[in-house]
Amino acid sequence: MKKIVTILVTFLFVVHTHAQRQDTVPDMTRDGATLNEVVIMGNNSRKDMLMKSSQSLVRIDKSEIVSSLSGSLMQSLSSIPGVKAINIGSSQSKPAIRGLGFNRMAVTENGIKHEGQQWGEEHGLEIDQFAVDCVEIIKGPAALLYGSDAIGGVINLYSDIPPAKPFEGKTELFMRSVNESLGLSVRVAGKNNWFYYKANLTLVDYADYKVPTDSIQYYSYYIRLKEQRLRNTAGKERDGSLLCGYAGERFSTSFRISDTYVRSGFFANAHGLEVRLSDIDYDRSRCDIDLPRHDVNHLKVTNHSAWRTGAVRWESNLSYQNNLRREHSEPVSHGYMPMPPGTLERKYIKNTYTASLGMKALIAERHSLNAGLNVEHQHNRRSGWGFIIPDFETTSWGGYAFDRYFLSDDLILNAGIRINRVVTRIHSYHDWYKTPVAGSDSVYRERSARLRRSFNSFTWSLGVNYSAGAWIWKANIGKSFRVPIPKELGADGVNYHIFRYEKGEAGLSPEESYQFDAGIYWHNEALDIRLDSYVNYFPNYIYLNPTSAYTEGLQTYYYTQSRVIRYGVEADIRYRFLRRLEAVVKGEYLYAEQLSGNKKGYTLPFSPPWSADVELKYTFGSGEDGETGFISAAYRTVGNQHEIVPPEKSTAGYSILNLSAGKVFAWKEGRLRLNLQALNLLGKKYYDHTSYYRQIDVPEPGRNFSLLIGFDF
């Protein structure tokens, strides 16, 4: 491995020396898919964006995020074909791309991978959606550039774009009816010559959210809901960030510090002590955050720098992240565990240190080379009376080289390789209470044994982009990988969130994926057509397999591997007519099947069903004075999902109607913005197959109105 790293470093030096001999500065449009350059260089044309990558690439700007603003960032982006929000109540969610979520996709912020407790099903993404300037989504394997976890795709978030004025800002007030949420977000920013700054503050409070039912069934129990609200799902969010930067002609750098804090309750009837046995009066107030609850705080300190030496553009990233997560529940004895001494069920402290160095250069005017090295170290410690994952450290380092060969401006070939090494160290853990053992005295049972695993990987990618008139074709084939996470290797305990016993497997192999993507795009002044398809093969997909056995009174699940095939298609068609009307048809379909193992012939757990959206949008206002507006109606249809992995439940399809409208008013030197949404206007009762609460028959929110009032100055 040391020899390979030495070769990569030497390779970077040789390329740097060769590129410096060129007399011309490389054309930035021939760089790889890096959104910072798209914004800075003003290269925003549709063709240039589509030609930047041979994979499916979608870009969403700030105005699009605001127009579909929802309770969380991923809910705001979930209308994009292939992108899904795994909802955890009404104000938190996790992202998924083409059915792959958690540790099978990466979220980056300003080029740095966000590291929280991604494995957890019960908490969302710790990022302030109001601080995000724009989003770039790569659908399909991206481990070549981003390393392990990017096997399903990447969501790149950008919040470091320099302001355009000496002083500017915005204030946004937003409300949602489904959980009576009320929030305020304020931004101030400015620049002085080469220096700039940006500060954000967001405050959100919300109550227990409403669902269109009076009762739900949890296993064999029927639970009545007061005023159709899920008890103890209220919460609050406090976010803040400060960015300071310098943007010179040949050197730029920015420092950013952000902190996100969330406190929210878990649905009291489906976690921990039964409500009827609790002393807490959950129906006293719909705004209280009682037990059980969790507190999550994510601190992030980052630096991004870019500079030129000759014809080579260098980039570096440095970051420190601290993720603190605490779960509190009413103490209750279970199995051989006596009554715990306090309410702290679980506590996780995760520190992540990241460093990367990359370069881009144009060689012989036809090769756009992108290469780099990166290293990451994670340090995780746990405490509390509940156990699910052990203490661990993970260190990873790797290098990549990616070349884009321009046969012409309309025909580009892509090829890349990456090497990686990951070392995971898992600590031993023994119960804090004794368990009787046959033939001997009681012992402090060892839940997790000391373990050290090393993983090496080699990944590659080949692609092509071709443009002819109004047509653009893309194709990409490659191999990706994902290292087993400590939960998959060392879990051994009760997951109280969904009442099951989870058991890890220390001998799991790294997950590999072979995928072929193809896309066809056509565009003229009236019509946009976008079709993407993919085939994905896993020789050793890792998943949590349910068994008929029971441990400590709960059904036992264990991690195992099997061969899996996945394929799907996504479509986005937009037609503009009568000057101000636009019709949009979007849809997606995914098929997955296990080809080996105990669940051979089954799909994968929680696979999303097919879906289709039809939208009609009317825009008004000339835009010359800054005053524009829109009105839209969208009809969403989701198919049945009967392809399940027991004990999953089949989910019936549904159709819902959504309305939205927005208007921008010029006011003095600023702009006043209004956005109104009416989601599920007809109050349809339906279930989301991938929702966190689906297994206990909790329907999705009913009729939901939201209002955003913003002022830009």
Can you name each region flagged by the protein language model?
Residues 232, 342-358, 503-510, 515-516, ...:
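Outer membrane beta-barrel strand-and-loop segments of large Gram-negative receptors
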Residues 409, 534-538, 555-641:
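Gram-negative outer-membrane beta-barrel transporters
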Residues 35-66, 94:
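N-terminal periplasmic "start-of-domain" segments of outer-membrane beta-barrel proteins
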Residues 377-380, 423-448, 452, 466-516, ...:
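Surface-exposed extracellular loop regions of Gram-negative outer-membrane beta-barrel proteins
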Residues 179-205, 218-267, 297-299, 306-309, ...:
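Transmembrane beta-barrel wall of Gram-negative outer-membrane proteins
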Residues 206-212, 537-540, 583, 637-642, ...:
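C-terminal beta-signal and adjacent terminal beta-strands/loops
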Residues 21-24, 231-237, 251-310, 314, ...:
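Flexible loop and strand-edge segments within Gram-negative outer membrane beta-barrel domains
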Residues 113-139:
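Short acidic/polar hinge/loop motifs at secondary-structure boundaries
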